[in-house]
Amino acid sequence: MSNPKRYRNLFGITLGTGLGGGIVRDGELFLGDNSAGGEAWLLLNRLDPAVNAEEGASIRAVRRAYAMACGIPHDNAPDPRTIAEIAAGAAPGNRVAAIEAFRRLGVVAGDVLAQALTLVDGLAVIGGGIAGAYPLFLSHLVRARNAPYEGHATPLRRLAPLAFRIDDPAEREAFLRGEVCSIEVPGSGRRILYAMRRAAVGISRLATSEAVAVGAYAFALRELDKR
């Protein structure tokens, strides 16, 4: 039996100079009444609720976290590419601090996705200049997104759908396979197929400038089709 599950909703974030966000609803870009839909940068910062999420998931956030862990001024911290190389052991520096900087990025970005996807209920795509360092933060991001609320007698799931990493072969296979069960419609005597509630987190393969160009082109074509 083939899986009937199909997706038409998506939430995307970009990790770079800032924290960007965008929503695709039922196959169309969601703008909002004030053209301010998807302002992810203003969501809660899980690790520092006194500031917004962008201060925990951006270039300056990675540099700041590395500088704090090293006890050096923020201006003396290297750029995220170098910090990623330090974390991978490919460049000299404080490796523990570099790993921690990207862990914090993953936690904040994962919580942002959890907040957004609570309402959007769709797939998640991550892009931007820092996305290339995903091996250092994606596991923390998915863990934060799947993390339960612990304040209940029994832990309560943060999101109804379970998140899977598309870049991981085993998780991708589990996501694509899913589970389909047959449930009875009360009072009808009929049974329907019900697919497992699941979502995926993926990394954009497009460079930031290319993604912007492709997105703008697709949006323009759709707007022309409406005329």
Labelled PLM ranges:
Residues 1-10:
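Conserved phosphate-binding catalytic cores of ATP/NTP-utilizing and phosphoryl-transfer enzymes
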Residues 2-3, 47-227:
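ATP-binding/phosphotransfer module of carbohydrate and carboxylate kinases, centering on a glycine-rich
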Residues 6, 15-17, 197:
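Short, basic and Ser/Thr-rich N-terminal targeting/leader segments
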Residues 12-14, 19-24:
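Short beta-strand scaffold segments in enzyme catalytic cores
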Residues 22-26, 30-32, 45-46:
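Short beta-strand-to-turn element immediately C-terminal to the catalytic PLP-Schiff-base lysine
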Residues 29-31, 39, 141-144:
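Glycine-rich, phosphate-binding/catalytic loops in enzymes
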Residues 31, 42-44, 203-205:
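Structural signal for conserved beta-strand scaffold positions within catalytic alpha/beta enzyme cores
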Residues 35-50:
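A short, polar/charged loop-to-alpha-helix boundary motif
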